[in-house]
Amino acid sequence: MNRIVLIGNGFDLAHGLKTSYKNFIDWYWKDWGEKLLHGLNKTETDGLCSFKIKDNVEVLNWASVFQGWYYRRENPLIPWNVNDVIHLVKENKDLCDYWISPFLQQICKSIETKKWVDIENEYYDLLSKCALKGNTETTVEVLNQQLHTLQEKLVQYLSLVNKTDTKICESIWDKIYSPINPKEISVEKFFQLKEYIDWCMKQDNSYWASKMQRYKEEFDSDYVDNYKKNCHKIYYVNYPRPFMLPDHIMLLSFNYTKTVHLYHNQNFFLNYIHGELNKPQNIIFGYGDEIDENYQALKNLNDNGCLCNLKTIKYLETDNYRNALAFMDSAPYQVCIMGHSCGNSDRTLLNTLFEHKNCLSIKPYYYIKEDGTDNYLDIIQNISRNFTDMKLMRDRVVNKSYCEPLISM
């Protein structure tokens, strides 16, 4: 039996990294503040928004606006706060014409109202409106260019975050490399557990010693021998540790950062399914929901621009997806979810993982909020959207009594 560990953004957040899209957008505006403070043109733009000094304002460029030619301060030696710069410029309609694209505006609106945003979902929603519903605010070509710009900015931001020193959380390591609890296996797949235990009983101690070596643990042959002699007397939950440790583990990271490397035992697999920061040409950033009814309509438009940011197509640029699929096909596996929201932007891949014939169970590790509540139900609701068979979902998802927080408060 194997294990696939889904590593999402919450995994980085649990290590103190500011990797949420909200963190990214906050940095984006601060970066704009720096640009305007030192801008050598009267119009500054990046395709997502623009700041154009009005013709009747007699300044040379944006830098001069903040060097005393427009804004005068009692103490000009005090550095400008970049957040103040952006706020002043956006609000001062006498100074400049400020334009923001519908895409960026929707992202910022989501952050303002919900305190979070999924940029990939916002892209897909606007793409559907633009291509299918006659929304004339933008075009598919312009929207794709704006997503590309955001991707470049995101890589730039995360590359800065990636320099942060992070440390292993021992409790997370223990969860990744823990035995599979038989009670977590779905009822439908329990026969496979019995077949697996029957197979285990036939293996000699040299096999188990080799397996434990991969986990860098000592092998207690007496415990296994004793179990084999008395197994007919022992309740099934007491299987020996070597039996229930996964034979192989794949850390399937949806992040671009290096944090997951801290937990990579060289005897197992690490798969950056969406690429990594040191290979920006392989970064996958787009939408991955082929189950949604709008997807078929987009495909039928015969416009490649509607499909160029489809994750399924992007997966063909590397071996990462094929390696994940080969791992799924190789043996029964448990899915453990660590920091992945299981949202619709990865729906196609998650559906393949969750409904695969070899999937034994799906165990989410949840997050405890400051008020003491947790997001277990939020994760389960998102998981349910990745299933087409709800009976299968109810059987495979591990109930909360056997789940636990990713990290304790």
Where are these regions (language model features)?
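Extended, H/D-rich, highly charged conserved domains that either
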Residues: 41-316
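SIR2/sirtuin-family catalytic core signature
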Residues: 1-15, 21-24, 39-49, 323-409
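Conserved phosphate-coordination/catalytic loops
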Residues: 315-318, 343-344
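Solvent-exposed, flexible loop/coil residues
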Residues: 15, 21, 28, 277, ...
